[in-house]
Structures are given as C-alpha cells and as structure tokens.
Amino acid sequence: MTLLEKIKQNKSLSKKDMQSFIVTLFDSNIETNVKVELLKAYTNKDMGQYELTYLVEYFIQTNYPNQPFYNKAMCVCGTGGDQSNSFNISTTVAFVVASAGVPVIKHGNKSITSHSGSTDVLHEMNIKTNKMNEVEQQLNLKGLAFISATDSYPMMKKLQSIRKSIATPTIFNLIGPLINPFKLTYQVMGVYEASQLENIAQTLKDLGRKRAILIHGANGMDEATLSGENIIYEVSSERALKKYSLKAEEVGLAYANNDTLIGGSPQTNKQIALNILSGTDHSSKRDVVLLNAGIALYVAEQVESIKHGVERAKYLIDTGMAMKQYLKMGG
C-alpha cells in the first residue's frame, strides 16, 4: 500500500511513513501535482496526536537542534484558516501584552488563506521582522520581536505556492504556531479546527510549555470572540489538561457578532490596530483585543484570572502604554 493510499484510507502512520510524507513534500524532483494531492489528502485525514508531535519536532530539531531560549517568553498567534477575514487581532494583542513587560516572540507569516497575514500588516506599519540572530537583543531593548516563518524556516518557502494552490487550510496552518524557533515558556494559540484542540494541547505539553491556552473561538474563529462560547484548553506543566468554555460577558465585555471584526487590506488593518492601541476605538474590535490580551496576560502569570487580565489590558491601552510599545517598535 502506498503512502497516499494509507492517508486516503485514514490509516495511522508510522514514523517511517511520516518521514516519507515530509521528504516527498520537500523533494524538488517530485512534481507539484503529486505534492498537492498528498497534502490535500493528509489535511483531510484524522491526524493522530503522535503524528502532530512528530511533524512539529521534526521541523524544530532539523532547523534548531539547540533550540534557543529566552526567559518567560510568550507567543500569541492563531492558525489562520478560519475564513473570517478578521483584522489582525493577535498582532494587535502582541503590542498590548508586550507593554505589560511580557517578552513576546510572535511567529507569523504572509497571508496564505486570508487578506492580510501578520507580516503583511507589519510591513504597512514599517516594522521589520527580526532575523534569528537579532531576536535576543530586540527583546532586551524593546520586549517584542516578530519573526517571519519563512525566515526562521526557509524550507517553508517551497510550500507556499502549493498551499496557495490548495486555497484552504492545511496541516501547516496547525504546525506554524507550534514551531516557534524559540523554546517558549508561555503560549496562546487560536485554532480554527476544533477537532484538533486536544491533540495540539498535548503537543504543547510535550514541547514543555509551562502554561498555555488553546482557543477555538465561537462560530469557528481562531481567536477568542465575543459571539458566544469559546472553547478553551488550558495547559499547565503542573497539572492535567483543563477544558472549559468562556463567554465575553463573563469577563465584562459585550456580545458582538464575528462579522463586526472584519478587516481588509494590510493598510486597513494597520489603521484598525492603531485606532485600538491609541484608545480611540471603543467598538467590538477593541473588545476582542481586550479579551485575547486578557487571556494572554493570565497565561503569562501577570494576573490571577482572565477577567483581571481584561482589566489590565484596558489599563494598558487607556494609559497609553500599548501605543508607547507600538511607537517603540518604530511604527
């Protein structure tokens, strides 16, 4: 039975199968249509937790056998792929969280399945992404670093045209946030695919995160949203996985539909972010940033609850600290 047949028949894959899957995707001698069919088939397969951890560890260990570490560093990002066309929520959140003194290493990419990826909006903001050898100094000076996935993992460039041709989320949407080149202490990760939450949570535990939260937003978004019950998986190195749901109203924020969070081009999304960070926007767009920043501040042990995290995020914006962080970055 070929690898493609095994995948199409939803078989569990061995370590050898996983190696073959990766080698095939990155082999320049194999035709693109073969890779597209293989990646499509794997994306439709019920992926085992072992398979996810194998893929993540393969990319990290192949590229960073001595993975760098920065004390108490956090990443806040989503998988993308939720087709919501929301503005760049997690990028905006990164400025708020960093303004609280949490070292943030945000690992992002250009748009694959949306109008504006994190590096697209950063380019509009005139904020450069950092090379790997610049990150530690950047964190020491500014407390916030942005890394482009195609810089930290150049091999990923080979897959960009294939992923764009598929035009729907693939396994690499799930892998991207998990392969931050730095060994993180804390992580908040939004996930568009609810069925993978438990697998990803266990993989984060395998990667040694001290604390992390996974979010499947109400109505399918890869961020915590204001439109109903957000599914939360809380990861801790000290206890078992904890699953619960969270509504915006429980932390003092108003209900709002997901379509009120729609963004647009990188230029539009830059302006939305600036309006929020400067304190001039008091719409649901601000509230969704407060919610996600509140979750991140809770994970980073800055506050004792998500509700307190939301209050802290309000303070950081309303006192100008979040905007000061943005200006510090050269935006």
Curated annotation (Swiss-Prot):
The keyword Acyltransferase does not apply. The keyword Aminoacyl-tRNA synthetase does not apply. Anthranilate 1 binds at G78, N109. GO terms for biological process: L-tryptophan biosynthetic process. Pathway: Amino-acid biosynthesis; L-tryptophan biosynthesis; L-tryptophan from chorismate: step 2/5. Catalyzes the transfer of the phosphoribosyl group of 5-phosphorylribose-1-pyrophosphate (PRPP) to anthranilate to yield N-(5'-phosphoribosyl)-anthranilate (PRA). Belongs to the anthranilate phosphoribosyltransferase family. HAMAP family: TrpD. This is Anthranilate phosphoribosyltransferase. It comes from Staphylococcus epidermidis (strain ATCC 35984 / DSM 28319 / BCRC 17069 / CCUG 31568 / BM 3577 / RP62A). The lineage of its organism: Bacteria, Bacillati, Bacillota, Bacilli, Bacillales.
